[in-house]
């Protein structure tokens, strides 16, 4: 007999990335708690190089939608997303915090942060992103993610006074899903992702 799923298991199993929101006047006070819980993550050497900015001002949300090229998204026939968000959370990466930490005396025998084959600042940023998305889903809203590769980064940094040396991983969005505008995603062939003992194709 299959055991009953835990709360966390159900949350993970039912979460999905949503990129079409509707406008809503409903308030979600729990959104205020998300930033401090998002960065409650392990960071390499306790570098604490992952930061977050929360945006709930409608004016700033609209500006971020513009800088994220939402207009081109709408022209392709998709519904509104960024501009209809109830909140946007920017995951920020401070690489210098990692380098400073690994120059300390207690890390002298560790692999230097400039030599990591997979930089831990990206590992830690991914952990923060997942925290944020699950916390959003827990409020009853739907989470989405937009990477920073197609954004006007300089303009965003200027708007939010983000220092030049800080990287923006992307936007984690929170909003009310537009269930009338669901796009049927084409099913892809299932690839084996879980392996036991050895890697098998």
Where are these regions (language model features)?
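A glycine-rich helix N-cap at a beta->alpha junction
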Residues: 75, 79-88, 160-184
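Short, hinge-like loop/turn segments at secondary-structure boundaries
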Residues: 71, 107-108, 162-164
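Short glycine-enriched loops at secondary-structure junctions
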Residues: 93-97
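Short, flexible, mixed-charge acidic loops at enzyme active sites
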Residues: 100-108
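N-terminal amphipathic, basic helical "cap/leader" segment at the start of enzyme domains
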Residues: 1-92, 197-201
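Small-aliphatic-rich amphipathic alpha-helix that forms the alpha element of a beta-alpha
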Residues: 38-39, 89, 109-158
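Phosphate/diphosphate-binding glycine-rich loops and adjacent basic-rich segments that engage nucleotide
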Residues: 183-201
């Amino acid at each position: 007999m299959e055991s009953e799923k835990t709360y966390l298991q159900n949350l993970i199993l039912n979460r999905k990335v949503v990129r079409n929101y509707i406008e809503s006047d409903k308030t979600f006070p729990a959104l205020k708690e998300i930033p401090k819980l998002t960065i409650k993550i392990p960071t390499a050497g306790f570098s604490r190089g992952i930061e977050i900015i929360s945006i709930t001002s409608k004016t700033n949300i609209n500006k971020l939608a513009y800088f994220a090229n939402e207009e081109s998204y709408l022209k392709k026939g998709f519904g509104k997303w960024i501009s209809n968000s109830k909140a946007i959370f920017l995951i920020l990466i401070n690489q210098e915090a990692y380098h400073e930490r690994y120059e300390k005396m207690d890390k002298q025998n560790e692999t230097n942060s400039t030599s990591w084959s997979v930089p831990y600042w990206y590992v830690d940023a991914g952990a923060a992103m997942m925290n944020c998305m699950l916390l959003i889903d827990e409020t009853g809203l739907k989470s989405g993610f937009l990477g920073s590769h197609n954004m006007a980064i300089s303009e965003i940094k200027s708007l939010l006074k983000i220092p030049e040396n800080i990287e923006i991983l992307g936007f984690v969005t929170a909003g009310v899903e537009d269930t009338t505008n669901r796009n049927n995603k084409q099913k892809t062939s299932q690839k084996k992702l879980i392996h036991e003992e050895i890697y098998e194709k």
